[in-house]
Amino acid sequence: MAKISFTPARHRRRKKVLKMAKGYFGSKSTLYKTAHEQVMRSLQYAYRDRKQRKRDFRKLWISRINAGAMLCGMQYSRLMHGLALAKVDVNRKVLSDLAHLQPETFAQYVQLAKETLVQFQQTFKKKENQSTKLQEVQSNQLAQTEEKTSLQLEKVLSNELSEEKSDYALETQPQITQIKAKKPSLDLSKMLLPELKKLAKEHKVPNFNKLKKTEIVSALKKALAKK
């Protein structure tokens, strides 16, 4: 088999790297090793700065728009908010060019943003007032319904209590009559003299201390008969 040689590929690779390193200082453009290192580093920087460039331009556009808006008596954030509410599809690049090159047309955009912000605030206040009125009406309705429900509950509870009382009275009446019927009558003749004197004192018999037992018994019978 024939021997394979990598010299053509190696030469192409070296020429490619040295071509990319053309214009570098010193050995970075002549020697392959240092040129390759510098090219790899340069490619990384280029990848990073392609993205950083977009950020830098956005900062520049915002600073130009802010400067133009401050000259017209408005902030950048309020200007962009007003244009968004007005549904103006103009990007920051165009606005920055207008603020830098055509300040009169840029002032018209600022005026449009101011008017839309005023209209938005008015509509927002109207909606707030309507919402507060609705909340007041709803709170009043809730309070009325709560009062009605509380009154209904009180009525129901009072009716239930009256029914329970009537049922309890009907149930207890025969028991009371039975107890009264079963209540034994006092046998005064079998009681002792001090017990009779206590009863006489309770029933307010006059001069019970001077009376005899038979007299106290007769007086107590008369007092109990009156009751």
From Swiss-Prot:
Key words, A-Z: Ribonucleoprotein, Ribosomal protein, RNA-binding, rRNA-binding
Function: Binds directly to 23S ribosomal RNA and is necessary for the in vitro assembly process of the 50S ribosomal subunit. It is not involved in the protein synthesizing functions of that subunit.
Molecular function as annotated in GO: rRNA binding; structural constituent of ribosome
Pfam families named in the record: Rho_N, Ribosomal_L20
UniProt cross-references to SUPFAM superfamilies, sorted A to Z: Rho N-terminal domain-like, Ribosomal protein L20
Protein name listed in UniProt: Large ribosomal subunit protein bL20
GO cellular component: ribonucleoprotein complex; ribosome
GO BP annotation list: DNA-templated transcription termination; ribosomal large subunit assembly; translation
Annotated family: Belongs to the bacterial ribosomal protein bL20 family.
Matches recorded under InterPro entries: Rho-like_N (IPR011112), Rho_N_sf (IPR036269), Ribosomal_bL20 (IPR005813), Ribosomal_protein_bL20_C (IPR035566)
